[in-house]
Amino acid sequence: MRPEGSLTYRVPERLRQGFCGVGRAAQALVCASAKEGTAFRMEAVQEGAAGVESEQAALGEEAVLLLDDIMAEVEVVAEEEGLVERREEAQRAQQAVPGPGPMTPESALEELLAVQVELEPVNAQARKAFSRQREKMERRRKPHLDRRGAVIQSVPGFWANVIANHPQMSALITDEDEDMLSYMVSLEVEEEKHPVHLCKIMLFFRSNPYFQNKVITKEYLVNITEYRASHSTPIEWYPDYEVEAYRRRHHNSSLNFFNWFSDHNFAGSNKIAEILCKDLWRNPLQYYKRMKPPEEGTETSGDSQLLS
């Protein structure tokens, strides 16, 4: 018999299977650990131990993610059942009261207020569910982004090529900008949603004749309509180039990559930030190679020619 005031929730079949999956993952993890321990003591092969430890870590991470999913779904099921019970109670209460006559503006506003009060916890539940889902997806994306970054390190000039080939960015880059970008080794973008939506752009450089910084960080506050400059790393120009940097910044007042790079608050610089955050970072490979225009008098084949 269930004590008065307690709640019991049904666990869907997919969740019971999920719990079994976590149990099997944990059991496999223990068995793998025991077997590897025996092999290590008998053969003293350090490399084998490292490989199994890596597999165990991956398996453990999958188990944690699965458990997070299960607990999140259980919480959602509980909240949904509680909401259904409250709605049914409200309907029974309304049926017990004689039907109302035409509503006056005052009574309509009172009813509207009551509906809005009921809607608030539903909105809060939706925000919580969305936040959990976003955090879960970010955890799943991270190992892929880390692997992508490691692979890009093996492609010389990858990011300089990507930026120069972008149809909007290419119009903002001069020959001097391209030479400066040739020293760029990596690009990273991080987004934070709480307490404010913030986009952080990090450009990594090897030693070059222009500036001393190894990392240039630019931060933007993001809202529905724009990217607004928030913070930027001051550029430490070398003395031999400082005068030239000043000349370039004041000689050309139009929007270009150098003015965005050297002056965080330059008018229109939010356009470049939006391109980097929303387009280049998400799929840079599509801009690494560009289409080669067909020569006159030749027919285009099914296989497109590409320029690196």
From Swiss-Prot:
Q: Does the keyword GTP-binding apply?
A: no
Any single GO BP term: spermatogenesis
For this protein, the record's SUPFAM superfamilies field holds: NAP-like
One Pfam short name: NAP
Which superkingdom is the protein from? Eukaryota
UniProt GO MF annotations: chromatin binding; histone binding
Predominant location of this chain?
cytoplasm
Q: Which family does it belong to?
A: Belongs to the nucleosome assembly protein (NAP) family.
What protein name is recorded for this chain?
A: Testis-specific Y-encoded protein 3
Print the organism lineage: Eukaryota, Metazoa, Chordata, Craniata, Vertebrata
Gene transcribed to yield this protein: TSPY3
